Amino acid sequence: MEDFVHLHVHTQYSLLDGQASIPRLVDKAISDGMRGMAVTDHGNMFGIKDFFDYCAKVNGKRKKEGLEPFKPIFGCEMYVARRGDKSLREIKQDQSGWHLVVLAKNETGYRNLVKLVSRAWVDGYYMRPRTDHADLEKFHEGLIIASACLGGEIPKKIMSGDISAAEEAIQWFKGIWGDDYYLEVQRHQVKDPRQRANREVFELQQKVNKVILDLAQKHGVKVIATNDVHFVDEDNAEAHDHLLCLSTNKDLNDPTRMLYTKQEWFKTREEMNEVFADLPEALANTTEILDKVETYNLDSNPIMPFFPIPEDFGTEEQWRERFTTEDLFREFTSDENGENPMPREEGEKKIAKLGGLDKLYRIKFEADYLGFLAYQGARKLYGENLSKEVDDRIRFELHIMKTMGFPGYFLIVQDFINSARNELGVWVGPGRGSAAGSVVAY
């Protein structure tokens, strides 16, 4: 049996079209022995963070068990403007686009995919978020491209009988992506005569596949087998059919409504080997793509602007001279009284989460200035001699804010609140949530 992974998968984030939940997909892939999988929702990347997080959770357990990590591949099935320019919004032809599967090969590719999808929504939206050849070429680095389903540019041109145009398109894609461009073949044969399903798709797929295989050989492009997954298990087909009725606003018994083949479930490796028994290389090429893809972290630390602290209070450089990294480590891993220190290993994890020891200098500097302002305000509100209760509460809150990395955020918020009150004449309420009960915020 040839190894195989799914590279064309729609989750429930393909709104009113995909029905599969990410955890169920990943769990099924792992239970079937797959080494990874892609998520390629229609026109969006809404599910990518959930996909990353769930795989990270699963891989944490797998690491403890001594197992290889399961590899997530981040992608999108994009719409490519049919007339070559995503800014065109004039005729019906502009309302959708050719389907194209775009996979991130590495972190650079992921960043480029984000740009492509964002620009498709912001600049190319016309019934669908559309990209175009110009953007694809501009942001091509680090991407792997596949020709998609019958809605793709190559299959559409083949079905229209324009083989030379299909060849030109293949040459264009291959010219940019080289060995990272693949042609897709799909086979959605309905075998149950009692099942109400679309039987025309398979006939079209067979005709298109024959030409694709010929063109692939002629132009030196590898072929991959995919299943255009929209639901997890075979017995989910009827529920998915109901979802399509909701999507198209049609009754179940409407004889004219859209039907899928009901073959679009997340098939096992064995099932895919059965469907493509005569094309083992198309199955094997999916794992070639899997092996090309690098793993990388989607998480990043919050990026906050620096609040300009007056120089007469001090500078960050002075704080660096005044405190050692060990001073800061103790301060950030103990309570507000400098007592009850965390175990070293736990403390190191906390510091790493804040951005590392070097970042602590900035946080400490901002925290001390926030404390300076808080005590200034407290003396105006409560008098020069603060009660122990007020002082303890201020110190406790300031310590919590500091050890969570929030002082800069509080300084920025108080700055625009003061501007709203004192300069712009904007009414400002007491706030909401836990901050409304904070003595420091008060």
What are these regions (language model features)?
Residues M1-Y442:
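Phosphodiester-processing cores and adjacent nucleic acid-binding clamps
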